[in-house]
Amino acid sequence: MNKISQTEYNNIVALYNSGLSAQKIGDVYSVYASTIRKILNKCNVQMRDDSHKYRKYTLNENYFDVIDDQNKAYILGLLYADGCNYTKTNMIKLELQERDRDILEKINSKLDSNRVLEYIDLHSKNENWQSTYRLTIVNKHMSQTLNDIGMVPRKSLILEFPTCLEKNLYSHFIRGYIDGDGCIYNGKQKFITCATTKQFCESIINILQDELNIHTYYRDIPVKQDSPTKLLYIGGISKIKTFLDYIYEDAELYIQRKYDTYKSFCHEILYK
């Protein structure tokens, strides 16, 4: 590895923080463990003592083999939106704002994982940045399974709606995606937006039309006319209420602050 990119630096740090030893990371990148240690020291990573390598991490690596319940569908949707799958290193990452730590803890539990969430202190570097928590899973089988489903590397440009889902799980998958990449605006103007690919937008538009008789559309992102990423838009109080009722019905997993926005929206239109 002649020149190491910033992305590779970040991945090496994430792999080490997820529990892999410098030796195993070196095997992945075909370099000596000493080289990995130098990189970690350069990144100011606190090194573990030797006893850490004997720690056993748990994981249900078959969790996504069959998407057959609402929690699997929701987590898959959130991974589609905010997750990364590095198939070269078999590493799956999901990073959310500090205030959303609770949902990461719940996902970690659903995966039967005892990985420790990594705190990323961004706010101290820039007061306009929000610190985050990151869940990192390193498992070849799970990484390959997610890749086969459609959570591929550099997915933001080619993402498509997964074909492995039954219709009764669409709403839970969409809720996960909205929790990751969607915005619910409940001010003077009320609307929902979601940035994704044209193909993904078209799939959701068709689902909403078939399941809810909601007609919506997507448009180019302002100042990015030639971008493959489009902006799905749902407007109108009746459509918004129908859509939110649909994705939150019987929901077990969700980001609390977005669910609170939904409940606030319902309260406002009820007593308007």
What residue ranges belong to the model's regions?
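Internal intein/HINT superfamily modules and their associated LAGLIDADG
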Residues: 1-272
